[in-house]
Amino acid sequence: MALTADVKDELTKVEVSKTTVRAAELATILRFSGGLHLIGGRIAVESELDTPELARRVRKDLAELYGVRGVVSVISTSGVRRASQYLVRVLDGGETLARQTGLLDAHRRPIRGLPNRLTTGSREELAAVWRGAFLASGSLTDPGRSAALEVTCPGNEAAMALVGAAGRIGVAAKAREVRGVHRVVIRDGEAISAMLVQMGAAQTVSNWEELRQRREVRATANRLVNFDDANLRRSAQAAVAACARVERALEILGDDIPEHLQYAGRLRLAHRDASLDELGHYADPPMTKDAVAGRIRRLLAMADKRASDLGVPSTEASLPADFDEV
């Protein structure tokens, strides 16, 4: 997940001056990375994050935007966790914070999706929503067939809200559920680049695009190699078949063969691996590949007719048993 770490590292360093944009990012991080909990009868806001840098960013925004103190603690690795997590918790003033960020509605009920003011905000605020969601629970895979920018969501409503936010900034995203886990996915390469730019990961976009182009060049080269290999196999198989049929034709006709047809047949047998174009160059005087093909075709037709008259096997009877018609 090196790319994911690169994106998150870059996004953590994005500097935002507008209060509404900072608030949109923070509210989304809180929604996608934790939630509301009752501790001693009081509502606490918790956020479980990947890096100490992001934990510091969240703590700073909590203090500067809402005047509350976030307590940071480290959740050590375990059998399930492969890396330490950083828990930011606000207990004193937690309910007020939950209301101010939109995590609680007017009736003290936890919201199911995202606060309406976030999903209907400005383009900059919508980009901040996506930045917050990615910082909280996003991932970016290497470019290729399975390339994807993906965000794990706390529920279907949150996933649909994120899809809507992407659409409003011109990026197509899809929500999907796998074994009860809701995700929003962007798969198109251009769309992934566009979203990374919107979120503020310009350097990662450059690296990702370079990697994507290298993969595309390699894939194209592989397709061409496979195409060439297939063509070479077909050409080789056709040459083997032609030589086998020509040998049988000369055997059937004996000396009763027009000289120009016999010459074409002998030419084919003398240069078994050559293409029709190359056979034409070997001829004396030179011939076009169509002329060579035409003479060989007439030679085989004459031999097959003679074989039919005599009641003996035709030229096709000489084809190898494992010959594949192409």
Curated annotation (Swiss-Prot):
UniProt DNA-binding residue ranges: 275-308
Keyword DNA-binding applies: yes
Highest taxon above the source species: Bacteria
GO BP annotations, alphabetical order: cell division; regulation of sporulation
Function text: Involved in cell division and chromosome segregation.
Family named by the database record: Belongs to the WhiA family.
NCBIfam families xrefs: DNA_bind_WhiA
Protein name according to UniProt: Probable cell division protein WhiA
Species per Swiss-Prot/TrEMBL record: Leifsonia xyli subsp. xyli (strain CTCB07)
Lineage per the UniProt record: Bacteria, Bacillati, Actinomycetota, Actinomycetes, Micrococcales
